Amino acid sequence: AHGGVYAHPGVPIGSHPPGHGMATSPAVSQAMDGASLSLDASAKSSENSDRGLLAMSLGNGSADNIEGGADHGNSQSGDTEDSTDGSDTNGAGVSERSKKRSRETTPDNSGDSKSHLRRCQPTGEINDDSEKAIVAVRPGKVGEKVMGTVLSPSMTTTLEMRNPASTHLKASPTNVSQLSPALPNEAWLQNERELKREKRKQSNRESARRSRLRKQAEAEELAIRVQSLTAENMTLKSEINKLMENSEKLKLENAALMERLKMNS
């Protein structure tokens, strides 16, 4: 009879004998080596049996022995190598019960464990001498090593290595403003020239208007002065005429007085 072995939670373990149609990657083989070292320690701990993952069930043991190993966790790893007897039906029942137990213990990662079990199991019929391994793999542990590396935002891709200048130009928004500063400057200078020209024209118009108003005011003042001077001239002429009349009268009086003097002498 063979007992079930429970690994520490989060440690994917598995063991596939070579030559039975299974191809193992280096990452999976490293996980298997680490699992074989931790079998003895995990079998002795009864507390980890309830919270651990069912990772491997070896041999063709009965279902009763597997349940006893799950409840008590005291089965030794040496029991897995004692006997290779059994039948295909017992092996199928053990594998189905172990699959069900693995699905019950890990409900979140059921899809990933099923896909990994399908990849790990051979396509042909299971022989009596072959050992069956059911590996429950958590996503992010062995899958990352098998599938490849995950690109992070800080990693430099091949396109960035080939064209570093273009990527820097695209990444930095300040370069966009530095590429075309000429056109806005020229337009700004032309607009400034137009503004200066308009200001100059406006100042010329203002100065011409001020000079015109000043000349108009001076002309009005001169017209007023001319009118006043003409009025004074008319008054002077009238006074001159009066004086001439007075002088004529005085001349007549003088002539009359001279005749009287001649007559009296």
Swiss-Prot record:
Region (Basic motif): 196-215
Annotated Pfam families: bZIP_1 (PF00170), MFMR_assoc (PF16596)
Region Leucine-zipper, residue ranges: 222-257
One GO biological process term: regulation of DNA-templated transcription
Compartment(s): Nucleus
Comp. bias regions, Low complexity: 35-46
Assigned keywords, A-Z: Activator, DNA-binding, Nucleus, Transcription, Transcription regulation
Region (Disordered): 1-133, 167-218
UniProt biased composition (Basic and acidic residues): 103-115, 191-209
Family designation: Belongs to the bZIP family.
Described purpose of this protein according to its UniProt entry: Trans-activator of a beta-glucuronidase (GUS) reporter gene. Binds to a G-box-related element, (5'-GCAACGTGGC-3'). Also binds to the HEX-motif of wheat histone H3 promoter.
Protein name as it appears in the record: Transcriptional activator TAF-1
Organism of provenance: Nicotiana tabacum (Common tobacco)
Gene (name only): TAF1
